[in-house]
Amino acid sequence: MKVLIILNDLKNGGVERVLSVIANYLAEKGHQVHVLAIASDCVSYHLAQNVTYEYVPIMRIYKKEGLLKEFKIMSQIHKEIKRINPDAVLGFDDSIIIRSVPSAWLQRKRIVVSERIDPSIYGLPMRIVRQVAYDMAKSVVFQTVDAQKFFPMRTQRKSIVIPNPLTENLPYRVAETNKDIIMACRLRSQKNVHMAIRAFAKFYPGHEDYRLVVYGEGEQLEELKALAAQKGVAENVVFPGHVSDIHKRMTECAMYLSTSDYEGISNSMLEALAIGAPSVCTDCPVGGARMFIENEVNGMLVPVGDEDATAAAMAKIADDPAFAKAISEESVKIRQILGADVICPQWEALLCD
């Protein structure tokens, strides 16, 4: 079976990581896998040698915004699908889906698409276009039941819920070796790092030996630094950027924090749970955190945007080592249900059976 995966790029991000895991698994099982990037040639995730990777700068060829640009992009994608001639086409990002599915449908390819974020954030025009694309697909994959229920019954009937596979060979947390509260995310509004800083400022009195360490890059960096200074915690809020050893740092940290306003399923959250980092996460749409965190059993759930509850949850973990140890030991059990050997065969069945 020849499978074409179309994406913007393979730079750091949850969608990109999951697609790389799926691509490598399918190739290992003997399928021909072709990964086509159309926005940039940035590759941050390993692809197996028998995965064909190709960058075609479709998104950079046409500069002027408008319907003509969209038509030209879709026309070029149509040509690439015809050239590669796959049996099945897989798309995750909505911008990729609406641009590639019509061409794949016209060429009678098996189409599998996946909703990766809170579907309610889009306005009516985007929802209509997305639904047209989903109607053309053979199968639609959702990360959560809440996301699945958002769509009409005709979409639900041909859909399945498949959570994200874990990164392979994750280390285990041995013991807390520093006082870092770590986040791993892009610095953009969806992640609401502003709330994390405000919560940390409330947590800080009595916990002056702790730091909030935010790994990641993005357009909000300077305003986040300014907020930390305004709250008087600039010395204890640091932004190291992207690091290659984030999993090792998760094994050493005091706790992991995610304050997103909405998510599909946070990959860094799943990794933190699997490693055993005591975790505090917002119970945000579309329900990914609550799928895997039972409050005060294997982590802490807090309401979206609630800095007081977030500060209190951090304090509970910091002030009660026995509690922190208990939720850490419980959270690693997630490995039993989210290993690539459990998740990826479900993708293979959709694409290749």
Predicted regions and their residues:
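N-terminal strand-loop element at the rim of the active site
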Residues: 5-68, 152
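Donor nucleotide-sugar binding/catalytic pocket of nucleotide-sugar-dependent glycosyltransferases
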Residues: 135-170
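Nucleotide-activated donor-binding/catalytic signature segment of Leloir-type glycosyltransferases, i.e.
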Residues: 225-241
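Aromatic "clamp/platform" in nucleotide-sugar-dependent glycosyltransferases that forms part
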Residues: 242, 261
